[in-house]
């Protein structure tokens, strides 16, 4: 049987290789299997792995591993560095089949040089745990990097220094050593007004998706407001960042993973704004404001994990997380409405987090598995505000929870059964405590190699104590899914979920009561056809969202000659959204598509988004109906690297409309962007970026950047950049808000020159 499979795999590879090759696009093929080494032993993942070869035709500016994924079919990299494959975030990045950065795969993507690796292997249905591989189905996605031999068991480093005007500099260092017993990756950067850096405190604080913090640190609107041009046009920004991860092999079956992250940012903002409140009739008012904000953010996170894996008999995993985050803001605000006044405010926020998880799995007679796990966390959130208008405001928030599970599982031929009991105690604030006790049973059946059926049922009781009141009720959850897998690309996935709990409990947990999910994709060599449809219908009693929620999305993807053509549609309907000032009914629709023109080596893409909302808002003591409509259209064209030239052009149109009472306000903005790169010689690269911001009514702005990169050798590079060459010192943008028009004016640092030198060894 295995011989037949290998023959099928080889024939499949021949079909893939026989497709028309295009030098401008990264080639890929399906490989028979990949070896994954979780500490001890070898796990083989077959029939679900794609290999991408890293060619010399990639963008010459490619430096780090995350730059590679911008050129690979199906991958997308966000501004935060998260990597998605066909809309699903990857679970992990392995190096030669071994887990290295188990806490955050971005440590590998951001701090390792792309030249260290020869190929990228995509793993579908990835399982990091040998026990889960036998008993639980998973649709997780992971990436394995094949490292070149000359970079193993040696120190690899990237060192860079950037000097900018006026008086700006930044130093960066990335050091790694990937040995047999010790694997370490570290990155440090120090920035003094050279580049603008913003990071999300919430992005680095979560331990896992199932553990949520009570509240994120709230940034001032000046810091959270986005601008339609490059962030480094703003000045007065200093930061330092240290990220490190270590993986230590202890003996033959134990591993210790350690990660340390430290980030601090000190930045200043200044802007002036004018807001016109207009609802028609007799109500119309204008407000002018000049604001200066000083902000300091810091985050320190320490994680340690211990894993022991004794082949197929016993596995244990323990983790400790310590986090400390702080935010301090000083505000100077001058307001002119009926009269003028100056306000000085000081606010500080902090959050301390402790998290622990541990569990053991024991296999008996190669059929039975006993499992025990426990999770516990404590979060303390503090916020204090001293303001001339607010006077003072202090908030202390505490969240504690502990979850324990005792379960067992066994296998009878192609059927796997698992049952157990879970206990949950959660405290939020001083007046709310939740207790849940429920038993669960799961069944998984593999009907041949193609069909897989799973069911899950949970029944128990819940007890909520809130401000002296007590709620008790019977709770249950039913879940079922059917998976038909013909090949790596050909599958049908159907899922249904139904649950019932106490409405008051959902104040803490946002979950749909009813959920349906279906996915279908089919492959006809040499053409891949993918159609994904997902529908979610549910009702939730969360303190933010209440009422009926509906989500639908459908995506069509066609892969021909290693080129992806796709079109997608998704909609989102949410009614009766609870806000602090009333209810909101909204609808959102998104459509996108792209096609690759072989004759011109150009990818054309289109994107359309529509959002509509209705709500009541109290304005000057009077409830006013408000309707907001926002539309965005984006058309882009991007060439692949063909010989010496690369171009990227995008045209975006944004339209905003608000109706408040009898008054109507609208604004339209066009944003054009052109990126050109030219490889002047083998080790030289020049680039130009031009942006044109054109409001329908208002001033036209143009921004131009230029860079010249010279690489005398494989290890040394010099880059000269000129930012904001049009010397724009002040930028004014108009926004449509629910009850009027807001004009915001921001001061820029003007023309800026930078020179960067970097070396890799």
Language-model features, listed with the residues they occupy:
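Conserved C-terminal beta-signal and adjacent last beta-strands/turns
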Residues: 630-761
